[in-house]
């Protein structure tokens, strides 16, 4: 299965689905994570943010915009706007869909994979702090925490750390 330039081998998963498949009819106002994987003991909601994919079109304007995105990306990890306005709503909407389709019978882990090949090395402490803020937001978006905790854990990975967490799912960059 592929997302942009990242190709995954999910053949050992019990089930793997590209939830935000282009052309798929989505419920009004909902946004989904990229993939949902079902394993024997858990499900994984996988969101991919690949700052390293090539600029679309390849013209100088697109290349500059892509470079700006790479330069600005570490700042996204330092504030909560991305967490609150994009990542958490996608996770919640995806869970709501799974719940309404009676596919939330296993514990769910939320995984954010950052395609970071073209980024200057990301500070591991920055990623840990970001993961903690993301998980806290997934558990509590209002004054009170969710009574039903829909995500039991959260991981923030890069292409380099992906094989450490999921050696069973090969990841290859297709140029």
Located regions from the model:
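Catalytic cores of nucleic-acid endonucleases
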Residues: 51-114
């Amino acid at each position: 299965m592929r997302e942009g330039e990242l190709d995954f081998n999910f053949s050992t998963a019990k089930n793997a689905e590209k939830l935000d498949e282009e052309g798929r009819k989505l419920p009004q106002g909902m946004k989904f994570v990229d993939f949902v994987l079902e394993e024997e003991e858990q499900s994984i909601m996988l969101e991919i943010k690949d700052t390293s994919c090539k600029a679309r079109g390849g013209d100088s304007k697109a290349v500059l915009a892509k470079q700006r995105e790479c330069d600005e990306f570490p700042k996204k990890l330092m504030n909560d706007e991305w967490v609150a306005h994009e990542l958490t709503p996608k996770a919640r909407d995806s869970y709501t869909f799974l719940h309404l389709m009676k596919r939330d019978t296993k514990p769910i882990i939320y995984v954010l994979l950052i395609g970071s090949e073209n980024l200057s090395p990301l500070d591991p402490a920055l990623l840990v702090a970001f993961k903690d803020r993301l998980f806290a937001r997934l558990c509590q978006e209002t004054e009170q925490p969710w009574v039903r905790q829909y995500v039991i854990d959260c991981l923030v990975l890069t292409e380099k750390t992906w094989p450490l967490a999921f050696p069973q799912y090969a990841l290859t960059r297709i140029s």
